[in-house]
């Protein structure tokens, strides 16, 4: 791990209980330029070869989440560790295994150190669905979940959840449902990525969700219920 300190941080106002995974369409050099230009940061940056850069001390509040919400909490900068991944297509093409292996090692270390629950390892698009598309449809959530990082689901467990309303399910999982369409798309990107079309990086950054979402609603409700079961069990 290499230390490259950024000055864009301040003091935390809450203890660490969440990991937020991001990606950006830059290599390390351009990522650092972008951080400086926009006066933002993350605690860690992982390049495509799996090299980890520590940019902000974990005990400090990095400026990575922006306007955000998850399970009733706003401003996730306060209570989270932010990890950025270099991804030229903004998470729309497969991540190199070396990069994912490095991420897994880092997340497992942080999870043990701060006693982070697996369901509190989430993506930037989960906490900011109207603004952000990362870490993208190609991020291997299922692969990480098999290693105790984040959650995945079994559709058979949907029948164990009585709730049927989409908005209520999204809210119980953790999403900000002020814009239900954006929350729905963020959920689909995370848990049903096969339904997410590939787009240009420019378009994704302009608007990370479509105005109209065509999806098999019974399948969506089933998946929502199955995910909620994993959180509540």
Language model features with spans:
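Basic/polar, cationic surfaces and motifs that engage anionic cell-wall
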Residues: 89, 95-233
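Active-site-adjacent loop/helix surface patches within enzyme catalytic domains
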Residues: 1-120
